[in-house]
UniProtKB/Swiss-Prot annotation:
GO cellular component, one term: cytoplasm
Record note on quaternary structure: Monomer. Associates with 30S ribosomal subunit, binds 16S rRNA.
EC number per UniProt: 3.6.1.-
SUPFAM superfamilies: P-loop containing nucleoside triphosphate hydrolases
Pfam families: RsgA_GTPase (PF03193)
Top-rank taxon, per record: Bacteria
Record GO biological process: ribosomal small subunit biogenesis
Compartment(s) of residence: Cytoplasm
Protein name listed in UniProt: Small ribosomal subunit biogenesis GTPase RsgA
Protein species of origin: Xanthomonas campestris pv. campestris (strain ATCC 33913 / DSM 3586 / NCPPB 528 / LMG 568 / P 25)
Class of enzymatic activity (EC top level): hydrolase
Signal peptide: none
Tagged with keyword Cell membrane: no
Lineage: Bacteria, Pseudomonadati, Pseudomonadota, Gammaproteobacteria, Lysobacterales
């Protein structure tokens, strides 16, 4: 880690978004408030703390802000892998606003958000072309990505192990029709994985998400050209794998991009901030706007454009059922979010709560 002044050239090699000092006024204000601090990126997140870096080769364990240690401090306002922070020695003194992120509703009865990765350009949604293949799960991931500012790319792995690759691609034709990129690869074959190069250029950051056993760690190793990430075999009867990746980590690639590998996630709850139109259901939302009734449930109402499309074989009924389920989940989470925001605003009035660091937007 540098102890004098920022080297923006080396910072660019781990995803710094500008050729020199920050151009975002919000970032500039935070830099001005901490004139002795230096920028670094969070490259690992553990239960006990963080690892940060200012070059691809140099990293150190960082001491987090004291308020992050409080049990009731919102988890999405703590640093996540991919975040940019300001450091004084080994101490994190400020968290810079996020340009993009992917979040989920944290498990449990109470409303919480969890940031999966921050300041990312691309989210690779990884799903195996075996018993792991689940279009409904892919749609759920697309919903979480939508609105966060990053581009989703669906990556179907294990294309060498199944005869059903073409059938799987046919199932996802509706997504491709919405300009959602889709690639089928053999995660062990460098030539096959080269299909992902357009999203892994110099200075870009991508994150891998998907269930355990989908091939994320294998894909990471192939992109690295070395066996850095541990991989496990999956069970043949259901294609389920053990959690190979145990923590989130940002890894520089030979291409000049950065890749964030994540553990498999069993639960994918919306945060309430999602937009179904941006989350893979723009066609269904467009049809819903044509229904006779504004509150159409798309079940048996007269003049329902969605039901008409299903009957004309223009929409997959299972996909529409998932859309309806997710719509209810998003609405429920949005109510909880509104309650939490109202509580936070009252707390801010008394000086008890900090502002959010999330400012989603395209890089």
């Amino acid at each position: 880690m540098s102890d004098t002044s920022p080297n923006y050239h080396t910072l660019q090699s781990i995803g710094w978004p500008w050729p020199g000092p920050p151009e975002d006024p919000a970032w500039q204000a935070i830099f001005a408030a901490h004139p002795q601090a230096l920028p670094a990126r969070v490259v690992e997140q553990h239960r006990t703390g963080y690892v940060v870096a200012d070059t691809p080769e140099a990293s150190l364990k960082a001491e987090s802000l004291p308020e992050w240690q409080r049990p009731r401090f919102p988890s999405h306002e703590r640093a996540a892998v991919g975040d940019w922070v300001l450091m004084e020695g080994k101490r994190i003194v400020a968290l810079l606003p996020r340009r993009t992120s992917i979040k989920r509703g944290a498990a449990g009865e109470h409303y919480h958000q969890q940031v999966i990765a921050a300041n990312i350009d691309t989210v690779f949604i990884v799903c195996g072309l075996d018993a792991d293949f689940n279009p409904r799960r892919i749609e759920r991931y697309l919903l979480l990505v939508g609105g966060g500012g990053a581009e989703p790319v669906v990556v179907l792995t294990k294309a060498d192990q199944t005869e059903y690759a073409e059938d799987a691609l046919a199932v996802l034709e509706e997504l491709e029709a919405q300009n959602i990129a889709l690639r089928a690869v053999n995660a062990k074959d460098p030539e096959s994985v080269a299909a992902l190069r357009p999203w892994l250029g110099d200075g870009r950051t991508a994150v891998l998400v998907g269930s355990s056993g989908a091939g994320k760690s294998t894909l990471t190793n192939t992109l690295l050209g070395t066996q850095k990430m541990k991989t496990n075999a999956v069970r043949e009867n259901d294609s389920r794998g053990r959690h190979t990746t145990t923590h989130r980590a940002l890894i520089p690639l030979p291409s000049g991009a950065c890749l964030i590998d994540t553990p498999g996630m069993r639960e994918l709850k919306p945060t309430g901030e999602e937009d179904l139109a941006e989350g893979g259901f723009s066609d269904v939302e467009a049809l819903a706007a044509q229904c006779r009734f504004n509150d159409c449930a798309h079940i048996a109402e007269p003049g329902c454009a969605v039901r008409a499309a299903i009957e004309a074989d223009q929409l997959d009924p299972e996909r529409v059922a998932n859309y309806m389920k997710l719509r209810v989940e998003v609405a429920s989470a949005a109510e909880k979010l509104a309650t939490r925001v109202a509580q936070n605003n009252r707390g801010k009035g008394s000086g008890k709560r900090p502002a959010s660091v999330d400012r989603p937007g395209r890089r």
